[in-house]
Regions:
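Non-catalytic structural scaffold of enzyme domains
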Residues: 1-157
């Protein structure tokens, strides 16, 4: 059964630090074709580094998408989802507009893990920042405590 978002005026914003989020945007559009979308890819500053840098660049992108009329922004970037999402949700959104939303990709990805794991072992290939955050193992073990998780940082991502 297809779930619909509550009334979301304006387009849905999708952000990534590069082009990878376009695959996520395509899937979102398949599931929710009735919405308009704005994609923001920050190729100029790709390969974000420290928490502070990831948070600041992600916050800037979210604010830009809000300024463009989006009331929902999806962080299609694992690094931004791992390192900046919670801070933006807890610290920034209440001061901007509590009715707006920012969502990440880690939790929805993890919800699919049980369906795809045939041997109770999942490998995660991601940026060093995403691997160091341990966001995937933490979320996977909340839903699937029996699944073993191995993470490998890919330095060129």
């Amino acid at each position: 059964m297809k779930q619909h978002l509550s009334h979301t005026p304006g387009p849905i914003g999708v952000f990534d630090s590069g082009y990878g989020g376009l695959t996520i945007l395509d899937k979102i559009r398949e599931v929710l074709p009735e919405y308009d979308y704005i994609y923001l890819g920050d190729n100029a500053r790709a390969r974000y580094g420290t928490f502070e840098v990831v948070y600041e660049f992600t916050r800037q992108a979210v604010n830009k998408l809000f300024d463009m009329g989006c009331h929902l922004v999806i962080l299609a970037c694992n690094t931004a989802s791992a390192k900046a999402l919670r801070s933006i949700q807890m610290n920034d959104l209440p001061g901007i507009d509590p009715a707006r939303r920012v969502l990440g990709v880690i939790r929805p990805t993890v919800e699919c893990v049980g369906e795809i794991s045939k041997n109770q072992h999942i490998g995660v290939l991601a940026t060093a920042g995403t691997i160091k955050s341990e966001s995937y193992p933490l979320e996977i073990h909340k839903l699937f405590p029996e699944i073993q998780v191995s993470g490998t940082a890919c330095p060129m991502w």
